[in-house]
């Protein structure tokens, strides 16, 4: 019997200003869905897998075809409902309602675990949407580069006087998210040694210029790192190997990186983490015929890697969990002090979240890189005093290869996001851009996620696991007129450990879009400021007052 999730076809988004749907508000999700499965973007496009283990864009290829066909015929007073990658209904709404509403991987909490999800998945009743895979706004590894860069820069500021020159970062994983690490490290001025078990992924990062070199030899990798750091060069190398083997070996040798982290797909112990002593081929085969054995061996291996990370931490080396839930897996395997080292959000990112600053991104539906160059210039024009952001944009232009439709990631917050959106819409209206722009973000944002082992770890008031916030975020973005809105479970850290929401809005050059953009791109980051103000963070409380937010039970207004 043929696999409904496997097809050798090649999918690429249409380019240019010619519509395939009835309006740009339906053309936009159509193009971004297809862009998610572009072979230059997705990790395993023939299996509908975009990134993050088994994060898919659609449940089956038949469902993909149905979504495409429906978007092509959808009217401006209709909304398509997508349930875990399956187009289940079209309903009459109104022109300011989202054209698509998406719910992916959501389970009643008692059943929210990998075993139950995998059973549903096997029966064709569910799909893992990760964060931006099933919400159709993945832009390749660039999508996480700036966040990783900001993290490394802040780590350098806290631990090394703001200068990472001559320093190096040890990490694991070069998948859709982890692949950003070597480039982010180099941009921050550091060298990077990234361990990756699947050579095809390392080759993907070489091809897209996210990593500089590749080796199968630990000795060679260390020699290169030593030479580069002594010369003050910032370069990166991918080491083909297993992080659960390499990390302990480095501890044994007494090697001391300057920063240690990990972005293997440890959140998914069946599909995301190679067990010690296994070949990749053996691992892939047993995922299908003996997933329990894979999970058991992978979890045991994660414990070994986390113990090595603890050894680095205890040696005084800054060590952080980069949000893949590997500490939780090790804890469940009996490593009682697995959480001794922090996650990256409480360690480095939370002050940004308190001001609603997060991973704002946009893509040029024209397919023309010049449209991104023009929007980059507009960002600089509108935010003339943000030299750190200007530096990022300059480096991004020089170092980041576009994957699929040209796109840009740019961390900005409440008070700036809507200004940029309105400016982009004006550029579409006056013909400065060749076609509309879509603006979205990662679900990893200040007000759109509840994830106690990642974004909401160690909240000041203990509200780490309260998931009302992403639900309110999704509801508000729907009411505000986002073009499509998504509500997911399990992204980043796996089943049972997170709930999160996403939104995308289209700048089609119309005055209606102006009104929607002003609402959505103000309200969306404002929920993040609200969430952190409610938790008692002074930065968020001050920012809420400065921006004039009305928060009755928080500010008394």
Curated annotation (Swiss-Prot):
Pfam families, sorted: Urocanase, Urocanase_C, Urocanase_N
Catalytic residues identified in the record: 410
Region entry Disordered, spans: 1-20
Gene3D superfamilies, A to Z: Urocanase like domains (3.40.50.10730), Urocanase superfamily (3.40.1770.10)
Keyword NAD included in the entry's annotation: yes
Biological process terms in GO annotation: L-histidine catabolic process to glutamate and formamide; L-histidine catabolic process to glutamate and formate
Pathway: Amino-acid degradation; L-histidine degradation into L-glutamate; N-formimidoyl-L-glutamate from L-histidine: step 2/3
Molecular functions per Gene Ontology: urocanate hydratase activity
Annotated binding of NAD(+), by residue: 52-53, 130, 176-178, 196, 201, 242-243, 263-267, 273-274, 322, 492
Known cofactor(s): NAD(+)
Record function comment: Catalyzes the conversion of urocanate to 4-imidazolone-5-propionate.
UniProt family annotation: Belongs to the urocanase family.
Name this polypeptide is given: Urocanate hydratase
Gene that encodes it: hutU
